[in-house]
Amino acid sequence: MASLSLAPVNIFKAGADEERAETARLSSFIGAIAIGDLVKSTLGPKGMDKILLSSGRDASLMVTNDGATILKNIGVDNPAAKVLVDMSRVQDDEVGDGTTSVTVLAAELLREAESLIAKKIHPQTIIAGWREATKAARQALLNSAVDHGSDEVKFRQDLMNIAGTTLSSKLLTHHKDHFTKLAVEAVLRLKGSGNLEAIHVIKKLGGSLADSYLDEGFLLDKKIGVNQPKRIENAKILIANTGMDTDKIKIFGSRVRVDSTAKVAEIEHAEKEKMKEKVERILKHGINCFINRQLIYNYPEQLFGAAGVMAIEHADFVGVERLALVTGGEIASTFDHPELVKLGSCKLIEEVMIGEDKLIHFSGVALGEACTIVLRGATQQILDEAERSLHDALCVLAQTVKDSRTVYGGGCSEMLMAHAVTQLASRTPGKEAVAMESYAKALRMLPTIIADNAGYDSADLVAQLRAAHSEGKTTAGLDMKEGTIGDMSVLGITESFQVKRQVLLSAAEAAEVILRVDNIIKAAPRKRVPDHHPC
C-alpha cells in the first residue's frame, strides 16, 4: 500500500502568525537582549540618562535614568521584551529599586543561554543548572547579610548608607547627603509602619534642589476661600466629596418656562434655601474646617465664612485620601447622621507661602508620623526625576525598616554570588556545570557594566575584584570615585538584602520563562464588521 504524503495543515485563522522552534527562541532572545542593552547604560553611579519624548496632542518630555520608568514609557512589540518590562514593573512595585539591575541580569542570562544552545545544550539542561546556581547564589547572599536591627545607632547609619547608595545613581547624586538625610528622617517618622502614604511629596518650581526640605505635618496645594479664617487652632475637619451647587433637574432635555422675572427670582430663592439647608446640615457636625473634593460655589462659601468655618474646595482626590488618612477622618458624601461621621483633627491649620504659591499647612495631625517633603527645582523635568529618585530611596528604606538585613554594593554581592556558583560548578559533573558557569558569568557582567559606564577598564577591574574574592576578601567591591577596588564596609556602600534577593530571583525566573519558549503564536487581527444598519 502506497504511503500517503500529507501536506502541512494550517490550523490557524487567516492572518495569524506562528514562529516555531529555533526561530521562536531566537526572536525571544533578540527581544530580551535588546531591552537589556537599552537600559544597561543607566546602571551604576556614573550611568547615563535617557530623554523620552511622547508624541500626540499631549506631547511631553521626560529625562530619567530609572529603568522602570524607561521601560514603562516605551512601546514594545516583542513578547519576550514585554516579559522583562513587566518584571521591572513588579520589581518597582515590590521593593522600589533594582529595576535596571534585574532587567540587565535577565538579559545577560539569556545572552549566555543563546551561546549554550548554539553548542547544542538542551534548554532543560540549562534550566536545571540555573536552578542549582540560583540556590547557591541565594545562600551566599544570605550568608553575607549583616543585621544591625538591634543597634539603633548602627541601624540608622545603615539606612543612611542604603539611601546614599540608591541616590548615587540618580539625578540627586550631587545633593546626596541632603536628600539622604531627608529620606531617612521621613522613614524613621513612620515608626516601623512602612506606610509611605503618610509621606507626602510636593513639587514646586523655583530655587534649586538644595532648597528642598522636610516639613512636619501635611501640606495641601490649595487656597483658603474668600472672607474665611486664615488660621484655625484645634481644628475639627469634615472631609467630603459632595456637590455644593444646587441639584440640577436630571431629566434629559427638560426645560422650565416662566412667564415673569418674579418667577425666576422665586426659583433662585428656592435654590438658595436648599443650599442653605445643606450647609446647616454640614455645620451641625460641630466643625470649624470643611474640605471638599468638588467645587464650593459663592453662596455656600459666604455661608461658611459667616459661620467662621474655613472652607477649602476642589482638593485633588489623592490629596483628600491622604488628608483623611493623616487627620484620622473619613470622606463623607451625606450629612444626615452627624454621629456616624468620623471627623479629622489637627492642632493648627494655617496658610503658608512656598516660593510664590500659597499652600495650606496642617500641623499636629492625628497620624503623628505624617510629614511632607517639599521639592524645589529649576524645571519640571528636574522635579519629576527628583520625585522618582526620592520614591526609590523611600521604598528601599521602608523595606529595610521591615527587614533590617543589608549586603554590600559596588558589585561586591554579585561577585560573591558568582564565586559561590563557580565553586559549585567545579564540583558538578555533566553539562549542568556549563550552565552554572554561564550563570556566574552573567552575574559578573553587572560589575563589568558598572565599570564600563564610569569609563574605566572593566576587564582589569573585574579581574582584580574576582581575585580579591578568591583570596577571601568578601567585602571587596568597585570604588567608582577612584576607579579602583575598595572595601565596601569602609566606604559605606550598602544595599538592602531584600532588593538584591528580589533582583536575583526575578531575573532567574524571567530568564527561565523565556528560555522555555519554543513557539510564538500571534492571533489574527480582529476584522471590523461593516455596519449596514440605517441611521
UniProtKB/Swiss-Prot annotation:
Gene Ontology terms: biological process? binding of sperm to zona pellucida; chaperone mediated protein folding independent of cofactor; chaperone-mediated protein complex assembly; positive regulation of telomerase RNA localization to Cajal body; positive regulation of telomere maintenance via telomerase; protein folding; protein stabilization; scaRNA localization to Cajal body
Name the Gene Ontology molecular function terms of this record. Answer: ATP binding; ATP hydrolysis activity; ATP-dependent protein folding chaperone; ubiquitin protein ligase binding; unfolded protein binding
Give the enzyme class.
hydrolase
Chief location of this protein within or outside the cell: cytoplasm
Q: Where does ADP bind?
A: 44, 98-101, 168-169, 410, 495, 500
Per the record, what are the reactions this protein catalyses? ATP + H2O = ADP + phosphate + H(+)
Swiss-Prot/TrEMBL puts the cross-link Glycyl lysine isopeptide (Lys-Gly) (interchain with G-Cter in SUMO2) at: 248
Q: Where in the cell is it found?
A: Cytoplasm
Q: Name one GO cellular component term.
A: zona pellucida receptor complex
| Alphabetical keyword list | Acetylation, ATP-binding, Chaperone, Cytoplasm, Hydrolase, Isopeptide bond, Magnesium, Metal-binding, Nucleotide-binding, Phosphoprotein, Ubl conjugation
The record's annotation in SUPFAM superfamilies points to:
GroEL apical domain-like (SSF52029), GroEL equatorial domain-like (SSF48592), GroEL-intermediate domain like (SSF54849)
Keyword Ion transport in annotation: no
Q: Which residues carry this modification: Phosphoserine?
A: 3, 60, 260
Protein family: Belongs to the TCP-1 chaperonin family.
Describe the function of this protein: Component of the chaperonin-containing T-complex (TRiC), a molecular chaperone complex that assists the folding of actin, tubulin and other proteins upon ATP hydrolysis. The TRiC complex mediates the folding of WRAP53/TCAB1, thereby regulating telomere maintenance. As part of the TRiC complex may play a role in the assembly of BBSome, a complex involved in ciliogenesis regulating transports vesicles to the cilia.
Output the PANTHER family linked to this UniProt entry. Answer: CHAPERONIN
In Swiss-Prot or TrEMBL terms, this protein is called T-complex protein 1 subunit beta
Organism this protein belongs to: Bos taurus (Bovine)
